[in-house]
């Protein structure tokens, strides 16, 4: 049964995050998805970020709405960019253009340790109405909503 890893901050849980999470469950099939959620301690963003507790709660609520049984996934706290993917046996890692370099680093470290590399599943950014990627930063700045719709100027 496939073990699939995906990680992130999942601030505002926007459509880009949804695509990553949905792809993880698609690839896992009858296997299990391990979602690494960035800890508060690890974050160093230019904008305020909701607490781990709030982000975890929203993530779990979203997965529940997807109808995924609890035994098909696990949410863990990420205290470093690689999380458990270095030591544990995963088959796939789901990445965005932003996290792709981390997956390459993970595979380099795994290979040095004699472990098989993870199959990297690359998921493109989801674009907002203006053709620019949806991001938590843009949402935080009030440019777009979680679905990439442009906010009207006041």
From Swiss-Prot:
InterPro entries, A to Z: Cyt_trans-like, PPAT_arch, Rossmann-like_a/b/a_fold
Enzyme Commission number, as recorded: 2.7.7.3
Keywords: ATP-binding, Coenzyme A biosynthesis, Cytoplasm, Nucleotide-binding, Nucleotidyltransferase, Transferase
UniProt KW ATP-binding keyword: yes
GO cellular component, one term: cytoplasm
Pfam family, one: CTP_transf_like
Compartments (UniProt record): Cytoplasm
Broad class of the protein's primary localization: cytoplasm
GO molecular function annotation: ATP binding; pantetheine-phosphate adenylyltransferase activity
Disulfide bond annotation, renumbered to this chain: none
Top-level taxon: Archaea
Reaction(s) catalysed (UniProt annotation): (R)-4'-phosphopantetheine + ATP + H(+) = 3'-dephospho-CoA + diphosphate
UniProt pathway annotation: Cofactor biosynthesis; coenzyme A biosynthesis
Biological function: Reversibly transfers an adenylyl group from ATP to 4'-phosphopantetheine, yielding dephospho-CoA (dPCoA) and pyrophosphate.
Protein family per UniProt: Belongs to the eukaryotic CoaD family.
Protein name: Phosphopantetheine adenylyltransferase
């Amino acid at each position: 049964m496939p073990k699939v890893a995906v990680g992130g901050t999942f601030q505002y849980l926007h459509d880009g995050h949804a695509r990553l999470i949905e792809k993880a469950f698609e690839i896992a099939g009858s296997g299990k998805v391990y979602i690494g959620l960035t800890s508060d301690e690890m974050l160093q963003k230019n904008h305020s970020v909701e607490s781990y507790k709030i982000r975890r709660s929203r993530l779990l609520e979203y997965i529940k709405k997807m109808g995924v049984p609890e035994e098909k996934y696990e949410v863990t706290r990420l205290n470093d960019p690689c999380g458990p993917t270095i030591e544990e046996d995963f088959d796939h890692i789901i990445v965005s253009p932003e996290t792709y370099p981390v997956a390459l680093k993970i595979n380099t470290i795994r290979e040095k340790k004699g472990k098989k590399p993870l199959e990297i599943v690359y998921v493109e950014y989801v674009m907002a109405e203006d053709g620019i990627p949806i991001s938590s930063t843009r949402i935080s700045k009030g440019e777009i909503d979680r679905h990439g719709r442009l906010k009207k100027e006041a």
